[in-house]
A protein has these predicted regions:
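Acidic, glycine-enriched active-site microenvironments
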Residues: 1-292
Length: 292
C-alpha cells in the first residue's frame, strides 16, 4: 500500500525572515571602539528598547545587527546612542542602574528585591534572614544571597545532601525524639539525629560548607572612591556599603554624591566585591556626611 506523502513541514526560523536593519546604518559610523553603555531607541524618546554594555561598544552593537534572534527589537529600533565609561567596571555599574531605572522592553527586568535573604546560624541552627531586617553590608556570618526564602532553603538542602547533614537537626523537617530520621536509613544522613555522630561533628561540616557562600562585610569605615582610568578618561566611582552612588571626573566632585545608601544592593555587591578586594584598583577612602 502506497503511503501518501505529506507536504514538507515549513520551519519558520528567525534566519529565514531576518533582514539586515539598513535603517540603522546612519548611527553606526560614529560608534566608538571603547567601553561603555549603548541604547537602542524606538519611537519613544523617553525610554529605550534595550540597554547593553561592552568593552567595545562598536563591536557589540554590530553583533546585535547580525543576530536574527533579535530581529523584533531591531525592527522597532530607530536610533542608537551610547555613553562611554573609563572601563568595564563603570560599564557594568551604569548598565545595571539604568536597566533598573528605565526597565527597557527587551532587557531582563532588574528590580530591587524585597525578598532578598541569606542564611545565618542563630542558636546553633541556620536561619533565613532578610535584607529588609538586617544590614547585609555589615552583618557578620551571612552565607549566600538568595532571591527568596525558598531558594535559601533549597541551597541549604543541597548542602545537606552533599555533606550528609541531617534535615531534622538543620530544622528542614521535624524529628521524633529518640528516633533516627528517614534519610539516615538511606545513608544520606551521618546520624547526628540519633547519636551516630556528635552535633559538633555535624556542625563542623555545616560551617565548612557554608564558608564557600560567605557574604563579605563592607571592609571600609565609610565611602570610598575607586579610580578607573583608560587613555585620556578617568572616573572615580563613589561606593558605600557595596552601593554604587555614581561616578565623577574628579575627587572634588565626590562630595555631591556622598549619602547613606538606601539598603543593600545585590547587583552592586555582585559587580564590586571581587574587583574591590582583588587590589587591582586605586582606592581612596572618603568621609560620609553625618545624618542630621
Amino acid at each position: 500500500v502506497s503511503r501518501r506523502q505529506s507536504a514538507p513541514r515549513l520551519e519558520f526560523e528567525a534566519a529565514a525572515i531576518y533582514e539586515y536593519p539598513e535603517h540603522l546604518r546612519p548611527w553606526l559610523e560614529a560608534l566608538p571602539k571603547q567601553p561603555g553603555v549603548y541604547f537602542f531607541h524606538g519611537e519613544s524618546d523617553a525610554m529605550p528598547l534595550y540597554i547593553g554594555k561592552s568593552i567595545n561598544i562598536r563591536s557589540r552593537v554590530l553583533s546585535h545587527l547580525r543576530t536574527p534572534d533579535e530581529a523584533a527589537m531591531l525592527r522597532q529600533s530607530r536610533r542608537i546612542t551610547w555613553m562611554q565609561t573609563a572601563g568595564e567596571l563603570g560599564a557594568l555599574l551604569l548598565e545595571a542602574r539604568l536597566i533598573k531605572e528605565q526597565q527597557p522592553l527587551f532587557n531582563k527586568r532588574l528590580r530591587r528585591n524585597r525578598q532578598l535573604c541569606s542564611l545565618q546560624i542563630t542558636g546553633g541552627k541556620p536561619q533565613v534572614v532578610y535584607a529588609r531586617d538586617v544590614d547585609f553590608s555589615h552583618a557578620p556570618g551571612l552565607h549566600g544571597l538568595f532571591a527568596n526564602r525558598r531558594a535559601a532553603l533549597q541551597a541549604l538542602q543541597t548542602l545537606a545532601d552533599a555533606q550528609q547533614l541531617c534535615y531534622g537537626v538543620l530544622g528542614l523537617e521535624s524529628l521524633t525524639r529518640g528516633r533516627a530520621c528517614f534519610r539516615f536509613a538511606l545513608k544520606r544522613c551521618a546520624g547526628a539525629c540519633c547519636g551516630k555522630e556528635s552535633i559538633e561533628q555535624h556542625d563542623a561540616r555545616l560551617k565548612e560548607g557554608l564558608a564557600a557562600l560567605s557574604v563579605t562585610c563592607w571592609p571600609w569605615q565609610g565611602a570610598i572612591a575607586l579610580k578607573e582610568t583608560r587613555d585620556d578618561m578617568t572616573h572615580y566611582h563613589i561606593i558605600h556599603n557595596w552601593f554604587w552612588l555614581g561616578a565623577v571626573d574628579t575627587l572634588d566632585d565626590a562630595t555631591a554624591l556622598l549619602r547613606a545608601p538606601a539598603g543593600f544592593d545585590h547587583d552592586g555587591y555582585k559587580i564590586l566585591c571581587k574587583p574591590l578586594l582583588a587590589g587591582g584598583y586605586e582606592i581612596i577612602e572618603l568621609s560620609v556626611p553625618e545624618a542630621r
